């Protein structure tokens, strides 16, 4: 990336990427849905409280950089937004999952990434995650991730990582966090089931 992204741009782009993979039936997203995705308290670090205006400004910048697109017209009563990160950077599913999680949660260890990307891509073992990270770190002309102290990795779309954040150990996932993640997965599966059921009667 020739120009580092602002933190709001990173969060918006990460949220779009996450929702495309985990809840494709609701993608692309309206501004309101995207605000909620950016501000959700689970699976986010730091937790933010963006306004519609902040998200719309980030979208405008991302569109200017060719990383986001506005979708309107037939079939869409309101304007929706999608990302072009995969096309722009030639990312596969596993690279997208790892980069997305680093964008949404900041620097993480290989083990944390393997667990937290489960809904997006199921890595068989830690070595697979390491191989993916090494591939992203050696991208030319611009690496997308970089290794950090304490065995963690950071995304570089927003520029070099904060040295203070680099020294802070990542907190282990709490039992509550695990339960929330499980519930989110179950809700997403229920939504898909209900949507399939509804389509049978259309």
Language model segments and positions:
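Short alpha-helical segments that sit at the start of domains
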Residues: 1-28, 74-105, 154-157, 167-170, ...
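Eukaryotic, polar/proline-rich low-complexity intrinsically disordered regions
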Residues: 1-10, 22-25, 43, 48, ...
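Short acidic, hydrophobic short linear motifs in intrinsically disordered regions
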Residues: 23-48, 107-123
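A short, conserved structural fragment
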Residues: 56-73, 133-149
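Extended, charged alpha-helical interaction scaffolds
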Residues: 85-132, 140-144
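Helical coiled-coil/dimerization "stalks"
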Residues: 116-120, 147-160, 192-202
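Mid-protein regulatory/catalytic core that forms ligand/cofactor-binding pockets
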Residues: 130-166, 171
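Amphipathic alpha-helical oligomerization/assembly segments
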Residues: 169-200
């Amino acid at each position: 990336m020739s120009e580092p992204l602002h933190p709001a741009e990173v969060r918006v782009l990460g949220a779009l990427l996450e929702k495309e993979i985990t809840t494709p039936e609701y993608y692309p997203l309206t501004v309101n849905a995207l605000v909620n995705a950016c501000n959700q308290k689970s699976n986010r670090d730091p937790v933010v409280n963006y306004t519609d205006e902040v998200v719309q400004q980030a979208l405008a910048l991302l569109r200017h950089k060719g990383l986001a697109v506005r979708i309107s017209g037939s079939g869409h009563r309101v304007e929706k937004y999608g990302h072009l990160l995969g096309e722009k950077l030639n990312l596969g599913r596993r690279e997208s999952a790892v980069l997305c999680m680093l964008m949404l949660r900041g620097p993480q260890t290989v083990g944390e990434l393997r667990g937290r990307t489960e809904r997006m891509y199921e890595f068989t073992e830690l070595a697979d995650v390491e191989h993916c990270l090494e591939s992203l770190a050696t991208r030319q002309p611009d690496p997308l991730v970089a290794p950090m102290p304490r065995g963690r990795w950071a995304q570089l779309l927003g520029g070099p990582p904060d040295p203070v954040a680099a020294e802070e150990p990542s907190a282990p996932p709490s039992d509550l966090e695990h339960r929330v993640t499980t519930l989110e997965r179950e809700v997403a599966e229920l939504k898909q089931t209900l949507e399939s059921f509804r389509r049978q009667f259309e």
